[in-house]
């Protein structure tokens, strides 16, 4: 959500930022809507002030025993009373139109975000190479999983349709181990507080993190004003909704392992086989709430926490700075972590870490009281995957596969697997 006062103060800067996102100038339209809102407020206030003044005049007229004048004034008061609901409605409608327009505009990118139209404009930030030799070729995860009978898309399709999977036996345990390992790492070494949040949230929560109203078609509605969460970012970030925090409480760092649900409305024809793009998947989420001057530093820290997962799993990856045309709606700046997937001989996204500034905080009315009497301001919010569990499973299966179809379990996961060091293939 944007601050109309800031837009009024520097409309040219606002329009330049939107232009970097490929949008036409909007400041003039927004200022006109704000003028209409102010006009409606002024009209309602003027009417109320006139009523107050008339009340005094009526008293004076009655005191002077000027009944004709008193009757005339009372008739005007009655007329103003009749008009008041309409003026109030006009005021509310003008504010609603402005708020809805502001809510539909994406966040302003930071100055150091690369300019670009789509993913081809993303810029590599850094990379990490596994200590193991990169596989020049290999089977894809669904080929490995289906061969062992531990990954069943056919059974999932009977239950739920396409873009679902049933995992069994040691492969199901490996997926569970990955999530547990990530939580232990983020809580034990990175200082995040584990949260078990609801996976059903209300409209207001989805609005707060900017899934609604723009991305309604990408979500699963559960009825009665509830939505299945597309990411734990939604409940974790909304923990501070309508709160005023003390600056000493910041930063707040939350993590959660939850199922996530996405309609994938725009994904027709993409990644139709396997687990890369599912309607339901597990993900470990990281959320930070900070003071404004600390958010850039926290963004780098969050990225490093997500990277640590892949480094401990000894998986090759690269970090990409997303360009203006590829970054998310609520983001000021985003880093994507892309892990090497031998079955496709390419990098695929496994984490996305974003700083949103006060964009979400304004939608949630999440504020903090600064030290030394500096008043109350909006917090900054950050979110990142730490990481997507299903995609981590894909990466482990494909990078740790053996010629016989078995999968070696990374050493950091073996304690979570009861000492099991590999998942047997069909020929072992």
Curated annotation (Swiss-Prot):
Molecular function via GO: ATP binding; serine-tRNA ligase activity
Recorded superkingdom: Bacteria
One Pfam entry name: Seryl_tRNA_N
GO biological process terms held by the UniProt record: selenocysteine biosynthetic process; seryl-tRNA aminoacylation
Chain sites annotated for binding L-serine: 231-233, 285, 385
Subcellular location: Cytoplasm
Pathway of action: Aminoacyl-tRNA biosynthesis; selenocysteinyl-tRNA(Sec) biosynthesis; L-seryl-tRNA(Sec) from L-serine and tRNA(Sec): step 1/1
Binding residue positions for ATP: 262-264, 349-352
Predominant place of localization: cytoplasm
Keywords, alphabetical: Aminoacyl-tRNA synthetase, ATP-binding, Cytoplasm, Ligase, Nucleotide-binding, Protein biosynthesis
Gene3D superfamilies documented for this protein: Bira Bifunctional Protein, Domain 2, Serine-tRNA synthetase, tRNA binding domain
Reactions that this protein is recorded to catalyse: tRNA(Ser) + L-serine + ATP = L-seryl-tRNA(Ser) + AMP + diphosphate + H(+); tRNA(Sec) + L-serine + ATP = L-seryl-tRNA(Sec) + AMP + diphosphate + H(+)
E.C. number: 6.1.1.11
GO cellular component: a single term: cytoplasm
InterPro entries: aa-tRNA-synt_IIb, aa-tRNA-synth_II, aa-tRNA-synth_II/BPL/LPL, Ser-tRNA-ligase_type_1, Ser-tRNA-synth_1_N, SerRS_1_N_sf, SerRS_core, tRNA-bd_arm
Coiled-coil annotated spans: none
Leading EC class: ligase
KW Protein biosynthesis (keyword) present: yes
Described purpose of this protein according to its UniProt entry: Catalyzes the attachment of serine to tRNA(Ser). Is also able to aminoacylate tRNA(Sec) with serine, to form the misacylated tRNA L-seryl-tRNA(Sec), which will be further converted into selenocysteinyl-tRNA(Sec).
Free-text note on domains in this protein's UniProt record: Consists of two distinct domains, a catalytic core and a N-terminal extension that is involved in tRNA binding.
Family, per entry: Belongs to the class-II aminoacyl-tRNA synthetase family. Type-1 seryl-tRNA synthetase subfamily.
Subunit structure: Homodimer. The tRNA molecule binds across the dimer.
Protein name: Serine--tRNA ligase
